[in-house]
Amino acid sequence: MEKPNYFQSYNKVIGATGEQLAPGAVPPHPVLAPSIAPGGVAGVSAANMANIMQTPGFANLVQQAIRTQLENQAAQQLAVNQQFQLNGATAVQQQLLLTPQQSLAQPIALAPQPTVVLNGVSETLKKVTELAHRQFQSGNYVEAEKYCNLVFQSDPNNLPTLLLLSAINFQTKNLEKSMQYSMLAIKVNNQCAEAYSNLGNYYKEKGQLQDALENYKLAVKLKPEFIDAYINLAAALVSGGDLEQAVTAYFNALQINPDLYCVRSDLGNLLKAMGRLEEAKVCYLKAIETQPQFAVAWSNLGCVFNSQGEIWLAIHHFEKAVTLDPNFLDAYINLGNVLKEARIFDRAVSAYLRALNLSGNHAVVHGNLACVYYEQGLIDLAIDTYKKAIDLQPHFPDAYCNLANALKEKGSVVEAEQMYMKALELCPTHADSQNNLANIKREQGKIEDATRLYLKALEIYPEFAAAHSNLASILQQQGKLNDAILHYKEAIRIAPTFADAYSNMGNTLKEMGDSSAAIACYNRAIQINPAFADAHSNLASIHKDAGNMAEAIQSYSTALKLKPDFPDAYCNLAHCHQIICDWNDYDKRVRKLVQIVEDQLCKKRLPSVHPHHSMLYPLSHAARIAIAAKHASLCFDKVHVQMLGKTPLIHADRFSVQNGQRLRIGYVSSDFGNHPTSHLMQSIPGMHDRSRVEVFCYALSVNDGTNFRSKLMNESEHFVDLSQIPCNGKAAEKIAQDGIHILINMNGYTKGARNEIFALRPAPIQVMWLGYPSTSGATFMDYIITDAVTSPLRLANAFTEKLAYMPHTFFIGDHAQMLRHLTDKVVVKDKETTERDSCLIMNTANMDPILAKSEIKEQVLDTEVVSGPNKELVRAEMVLPVLEVPTEPIKQMIMTGQMTMNVMEDMNVQNGLGQSQMHHKAATGEEIPNSVLLTSRAQYQLPDDAIVFCNFNQLYKIDPSTLDMWIKILENVPKSILWLLRFPYQGEEHIRKYCVERGLDPSRIVFSNVAAKEEHVRRGQLADVCLDTPLCNGHTTGMDILWTGTPMVTMPLESLASRVATSQLYALGVPELVAKTRQEYVSIAVRLGTDADHLANMRAKVWMARTSSTLFDVKQYCHDMEDLLGQMWKRYESGMPIDHITNNTETPHGL
């Protein structure tokens, strides 16, 4: 069982920075026009800018850019000074050095210069103007303005002073005065480009973008070499959404001076935001070529590599940036972020701690550091660090959201829910909190609330990959598999490396039956994240289902190495070992598995052991019920949301049968085809008394084209293919419309089940029967059809259903119809030999021609058998025909693989091993063979002189204690062997190894391959005794072996699955084959193996009881079942509550 779909708790990296501005390295342009362009693609129109500006993280980037520029003006000027040497700089270069915000004109040469008195000293206007510029460049705006005012008072038309006053007032936020000085400058010289550029800054700051653009454009028109104006124009164009023109403006600036590495870096930022990563990369590389010590370009180039998935190159460039500038805070943050994504957690912690050394009260860095602690499993440390981030920045929704994630991981779900709500209180559009709160609601079973929250998260942020994946998981749970696939694909489109989405989509594809596509998804998830334990576990499960045990064990083991505390992987790995009988550390493994299940049930989690596997482990009845109940709840939850607001299904009228209608019974199964369940019950629909019941069969699987399916379709009054109605709600509506009185669940939790249909209650009475050997644990199932031996009242606490007893056994087999050619047999022997009657056998549907041969002799044995439904004990005479002919030619035929031969002149026989090749439908049991089939021990390498003990069950039903009993039996029965099946083949080496370790000669264990149905049953005649598996009996295989007349030894335990064989044997009238203890089990088998007369008598008794008892009597079974179903309806009809129906049947003493 693969783990139920993983719900991504989106642990957002708080305030993750992208491209970084160079502190102090930006050429003159307005501080409020950051060099970062909004995220988007090339050619984004202005109409789409609003959406682009909402890109997660964009606002943080812009604010960081602005804050960096404002806080580092002095450093900016220093960096520019390093780029352009003041001594010998060109006029254009001198212009770039004047101010980070405003453009100033060069002083106009005047002769002679007027003077002003400064600090009692007479100075020229030129000297005072220079002093004003120096103070401005140092950020000393008050002193700069004082000097400018002295000049202005003396010369109101001094153009450089007017421009400088405009710049000073812009920096000090006196925007109106800044605008007035710019207008005065234009009045003085209407061709002054700098004045128009500064006026553009004013309009941009006031939000009048069009006016700003007009002034910037006029500035560059007046002065085409005006770099400052081009940069300001580029920033304004970005704000207006005209990204292509902004790129052009940057290019124009760089054509004037290609060595402006800061401008080139800003152009790279814009190109990156437009999705033009390769062009951005060229810009950053050119900036680094121009100035190799330019740390910002190294950091920005790291951002590009990170966006392209080149994680190691990104790490290298961020590390280079912090090497060049050890105080580069943003580079440390980016380095920490990319190391976190690469899951290099220790180095990520170091990077974040270095950032905190530079800025100890940086809430964002505390938040990111907490995320790493969370990923490392240091939950308490993560919680403390998130709380520190919140203390530093109380209005921090991301931190509240991530704190909630950590609290939830710790098990503090209530507190986690409160933190998500706090995040949403601070920011109602916080999509992460919507998503994560939905996860909690989903785990609480509040599917409707969860769905609403996921949809809300996607409404806020349609590109939210985790929310798409989580919504898909709910859709999968509801059976809307195609819709789920669409959302998983959308999640992967948004986040191509979203490993969880790939893994979950694999689960959905597996459920849809597309195993190859599911494997591809799991492998892709592992390729993305080799440490993704869930994906390894899911891949293991699909290998397990396909019987690829080596691959399954390897993948489960890998999952556990990656995640030692992984209950699903541990329990599934334990089941794999059980399947192949690998019992190393068996007791320890089983104890741990039981503890895992008990812990999960205590915490009200879905257990990691599937209901159908729970019978294999020493779990309490309460635990098995709880496991089943959890799965029943999943079925109920899946359909509950679908039916909200719909009219409840209308049941058949309570008095419809009383008013003359026949009782309508509906059999529901996915196994109407070539499946053991159909092999058992295919004749029942046709043998029901149609004067009493009206039979409906509802198939959950498509037509497999076999005769089994055809027989059921033809002999049922109504056969409905529900596989063509995939919607459980509509399927339930169909059943309700058919007016079914009693609906019978034949699947339980086996493959192909649709218990969701039963959860919708389409019938007033719903019953478990035959196909699933345990309780459903479901409140929507009323009865389980069983018997007093299989389910004595003392074990009623093992079921949520009420017990409804059949009078003999609840089990049935169609062998008398399906395999009637095995009703009789002829033993073939050489004259004068004492070969056993189980060495060489002939079977055919018509024995008369063989029995007429003169070579036929008769062996007669008297025995006592039960007869009929009243189980009357009667004497019976077994007459066994023996054909005495030379057997050597037959043995040669078998050794050479010859298909047919003449035993006598007119008697052609067929090698029984050739049935599959010669008659396919006869081999599968769909048709009765029309030839004489020869079955020999030689065909299976079984010695003629040996006592052959057999077991044809799947090997997972064997446990160490069972094999220990079998070894003891072999040790006490000379010349005995144990005949098992390679079911699966991987179990053979482990069983042989176990036996050898306990001193048993490995040659005494014989394995055969799994065979088609007819051969599988027929070859059972070659065994002397069948040894049943107490842990989980042979159910269908028990019926198979008994049909061949072979005695079966069993021992009932406490589970239903462990008591079926006992019920069969009691119904057959041979309770002496049922042991109460392990010692008795061994004793019964040893006596059969060592006492030839006792064995012969027991074989005769079983052989005769097949046809005299009710065990294989389908007609009688139908009559008994009709009585029982009628009693259920009578109780309902009279308004009586559901209760046990025992019909005073008593459980035999000691059972």
UniProtKB/Swiss-Prot annotation:
Residues reported in the UniProt entry to bind UDP: 954, 957, 1010-1013, 1016-1019, 1034-1036, 1040
Catalytic activity: L-seryl-[protein] + UDP-N-acetyl-alpha-D-glucosamine = 3-O-(N-acetyl-beta-D-glucosaminyl)-L-seryl-[protein] + UDP + H(+); L-threonyl-[protein] + UDP-N-acetyl-alpha-D-glucosamine = 3-O-(N-acetyl-beta-D-glucosaminyl)-L-threonyl-[protein] + UDP + H(+)
Gene that specifies this protein: ogt-1
Inactivation phenotype: Cells lack O-GlcNAc post-translational modification and brood size decreases with increasing ambient temperature. Reverses at a speed similar to the wild-type but for significantly longer duration following mechanosensory stimulation.
UniProt-listed Enzyme Commission number(s): 2.4.1.255
SMART domains with a match to the protein in the record: TPR (SM00028)
Protein name (database record): UDP-N-acetylglucosamine--peptide N-acetylglucosaminyltransferase
Cellular component GO terms, alphabetical: nucleus; perinuclear region of cytoplasm
Description of its domains: The TPR repeat domain mediates recognition of protein substrates.
Protein's job: Addition of nucleotide-activated sugars directly onto the polypeptide through O-glycosidic linkage with the hydroxyl of serine or threonine. Influences tap habituation in the mechanosensory neurons cell autonomously.
